[in-house]
Amino acid sequence: VDKLIVEKTIPDHCFDLAPRLKSIDRYELGVWGLDPLQALLQPFRYTRSNVHSFTILTESKQEVVAIFGAVPVRHNHKIGTIWFLSSDLLDKNYLYFLKRNKKWLRYLEENYIFLSNYITEEHTRSIKWLKWQGFKFSKPLLVKNV
């Protein structure tokens, strides 16, 4: 188990992580018609205020483990879409991550009055993690006939 560090995302982190995304994350992006690299670079395209993107790296090798953040919706910078995309390196460091991730969620929450996102029902581990974090789920939605 390696120590994990968090720093502000730079585009190179996105280029590093995109080809190594977990298959469940690639699947979920595909449901929305998104390419992994485009999705990871999306926060850099926004000119809105209150955009946050952070990278989790292994301390020893500086390997990108995950990228996460929140982006405000178009007409209200206090309502955000939260997201988290990771590589298989997260599994190797999952307990370390779990013990330290709540402070980053609290940081994102401080910047918004409401955070939301959509998740596929196949993403069971993330659903458990989100519930553990205190997120509430609404009724299922049909997306593009999937």
What is each of the regions a protein language model found here?
Residues 115-131, 136, 142-145:
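Conserved beta-strand-loop-alpha-helix junction that forms the acyl-donor binding cleft
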Residues 30-51:
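Active-site rim helix/loop that mediates acceptor-substrate recognition in acyltransferases
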Residues 68-77:
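A conserved beta-strand-loop-helix scaffold within acyl/acetyltransferase catalytic domains
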Residues 93-107, 128, 132:
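Conserved acetyl-CoA-binding loop-helix of GNAT-fold acetyltransferases
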Residues 50-69:
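Conserved beta-hairpin
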